[in-house]
């Protein structure tokens, strides 16, 4: 059973004003050109079943257990992956660690008075305030109504300020926090004391976010000084969660339209939704970077490090040509005039066996969310069934996965077509193995709105996120290179070219149709490709004119990647 994430945003008042964040170079700016307009954040890859037991050596694995009734039970461990960065917040600085997430846009950190911390346990005498409100005037939550994530659902509301600035609506109620729940070791990733910082300023805007696994965070927005990597950031709005059962906060670097002040129900309560300057925008407005862009490089699945690079692209970390495709708006029918998340169009999916045997499964256009906060890959049920059939995999209702013979080598690849260029992912990227038993780590979804390209896909791609032009540039990732060839992004991504099918994007949902051909290029639509691409006229059979990814690479920047995996049984 898939654990679905549920996120909701609750805002008690609008920010009083927009604060322009500033970046002050730290003393140890950079060893290279101090005038370079890019920012590198380092990350590690870590794995585990929870944030409390993560480690760099805990790779995803499948274990077989013999039950008393004679049946074998499959236990899947270490399945979830995240990225984390270390921050110093406040004056004097307090150390906290947060997860980096391209699928959200707000920064929140854990408060030191969190009652779920074992050090703060006061049993049932420690109570939390739950805002109660009359929804009759709001028409419900905008987030709930639009279901912006497809596979995510939730509720949100903006609550008018009271005398305290935190309550609202028709009153408040209290709920106790049992001592049995106050068990978190909050010192592991750090907490933040607002009273311990002379520079913290609250703006009395209430924040709340919740997740489908039962975790949540609530608190108040404010501003303070942040130090991360070689930067000192001032004026960045973030939330301090004085109540959360999640052991780590989140640094959201997504589109500003995904901020809780915009995609929550602020419009229903105040008459307008608004966006504030989140972390990537603050970097640009302060002059630290020239464009609101960043490049993500996960390296291969066995690597312990990866990088994210704000405001630049590293040509040493990818091979072939960097192709650009538009971000598509999957929520236009819900009233959004522009995209709020990183959805792109998959124009086709196929399977290749070392290029000697290629088969196209479908050329139906599918919208897919690029999400570094999701470990596995989720595709429409019909497509997963096609892949399973080609691999000879059988679905096990008891396990909830397709079971297949473990591949003997990496010759088999799943090929994703994006507007006429390919990202090839070896089958091993999607395999969960015990050594003798293998599971297909591609999860079927009920329709195309739930398609997610998670880390198992993103490991194979170098991805540049252009938040200003609403475009994504991708190329095949090059692994374990120590060289750098960094180029600043000013307006458009350097060396990137529009994909030949740039305008051939998803617009409406459609049934998945089998067949087609992604391994040849129609002669009437031949585009100029750099690299060693052979073109030919499309035919009914998938004769190979496979795109060669060439020999260019893009370097990215370091962050701390944390992998957690939930058992889907």
Curated annotation (Swiss-Prot):
pH dependence statement: Optimum pH is 4.0.
Positions of GPI-anchor amidated asparagine lipidation: 548
Propeptide: 22-67, 549-569
GO MF, one annotated term: aspartic-type endopeptidase activity
Top enzyme class: hydrolase
An annotated GO cellular component: fungal-type cell wall
Reactions listed under catalytic activity: Hydrolyzes various precursor proteins with Arg or Lys in P1, and commonly Arg or Lys also in P2. The P3 amino acid is usually non-polar, but otherwise additional basic amino acids are favorable in both non-prime and prime positions
Superkingdom of origin: Eukaryota
Domain Peptidase A1: 83-475
The keyword Transport is annotated on this UniProt entry: no
Topology within the bilayer: Lipid-anchor; GPI-anchor
Keywords on record: Aspartyl protease, Autocatalytic cleavage, Cell membrane, Cleavage on pair of basic residues, Disulfide bond, Glycoprotein, GPI-anchor, Hydrolase, Lipoprotein, Membrane, Protease, Signal, Zymogen
Active-site residue numbers: 101, 371
GO biological process: fungal-type cell wall organization; peptide mating pheromone maturation involved in positive regulation of conjugation with cellular fusion; protein processing; signal transduction involved in filamentous growth
Residue stretches in coiled coil: none
Family: Belongs to the peptidase A1 family.
Subunit structure: Consists of an alpha and a beta subunit, which are maintained together by a disulfide bond.
Protein function: Cleaves proteins C-terminally to mono- and paired-basic residues. Involved in the shedding of a subset of GPI-anchored plasma membrane proteins from the cell surface, including itself, GAS1 and MSB2. May also play a role in the maturation of GPI-mannoproteins associated with the cell wall. Can process the alpha-mating factor precursor. Required for cell wall integrity.
Name recorded for this polypeptide: Aspartic proteinase 3
Source organism (scientific name): Saccharomyces cerevisiae (strain ATCC 204508 / S288c) (Baker's yeast)
